[in-house]
């Protein structure tokens, strides 16, 4: 039996839930508006500015009563507060100071020298490209008997002193672009060539289809037989084009 005659129970429950939600929404809106219209923050904000004004009037009255006693304290505070910005300026100057360039003496086998200017963040490769453009692959740099072979290493990581000597060896022939293979190893194929195996697989599949067509002729209508013949002709032409001498 329905709660209300002529109206289903589902409709009654739905309207009841909507009514409850409406009541809750109205209650929340009423509490929100009352909190936003609370006059307490305004009164606290108006009372706080009164304190500095009272303090200023008290200071002015003290100055009027004893002007001679206040002036020494002001003179004493002025110079003590002045060196603070100077300390900040001196503390901020070291990060802004630029790094000094490195002066390098490049000494060749014939005892001739060449002065190069570089920065600590420059790499060995950039130094070669700058001083020997187009011949950086032929140049070898040696420092204190150690070959500087890593072109990505920076000059700052070597801790080079100013006006240090780097021995340069310039070879007459360009080195191979790829490292040579170790003895006893021969370069083999890079991988399995799938293209060379595709045609034999297709031929094997074609032979299997022709075998099924001969053994099970009723399952192959005329259209399937003609398609198989055309596929055979196309594959034969492809094989002839690939393996033609």
From Swiss-Prot:
Domain of life: Eukaryota
Pfam families: ubiquitin
Keyword Hydrolase (UniProt): no
Inducers of expression: Up-regulated in regenerating liver.
Keyword Transmembrane helix: yes
Region described as Required to release iHOPS from membranes: 2-30
GO biological process, one term: ERAD pathway
InterPro entries associated with the record: TMUB1/2, Ubiquitin-like_dom, Ubiquitin-like_domsf
Modified residues (Phosphoserine): 73, 97, 126
Region Disordered, residue ranges: 34-100
GO CC aspect terms: centrosome; nucleolus; postsynaptic membrane; postsynaptic recycling endosome membrane
Keywords: Cell membrane, Cytoplasm, Cytoskeleton, Endosome, Membrane, Nucleus, Phosphoprotein, Postsynaptic cell membrane, Synapse, Transmembrane, Transmembrane helix
Localization (cell): Membrane; Postsynaptic cell membrane; Recycling endosome; Cytoplasm
Record domain Ubiquitin-like: where: 102-175
Transmembrane segments: 11-31, 194-214, 219-239
Membrane topology: Multi-pass membrane protein
Regions of compositional bias (Polar residues) in chain numbering: 34-51
PANTHER family listed in its UniProt record: PROTEIN C7ORF21, TRANSMEMBRANE AND UBIQUITIN-LIKE DOMAIN-CONTAINING PROTEIN 1
Subunit structure, as described in the record: Interacts with EEF1A1, GRIA2, GRIP1. Interacts with CAMLG, TUBG1. Interacts with NPM1 and CDKN2A; TMUB1 can enhance interaction between NPM1 and CDKN2A and is proposed to bridge the proteins; proposed to be mediated by iHOPS. Interacts with ERLIN2 and AMFR; TMUB1 promotes the interaction of ERLIN2 with AMFR.
Stated role: Involved in sterol-regulated ubiquitination and degradation of HMG-CoA reductase HMGCR. Involved in positive regulation of AMPA-selective glutamate receptor GRIA2 recycling to the cell surface. Acts as a negative regulator of hepatocyte growth during regeneration.
Protein name: Transmembrane and ubiquitin-like domain-containing protein 1
Organism: Rattus norvegicus
Chain's gene name: Tmub1
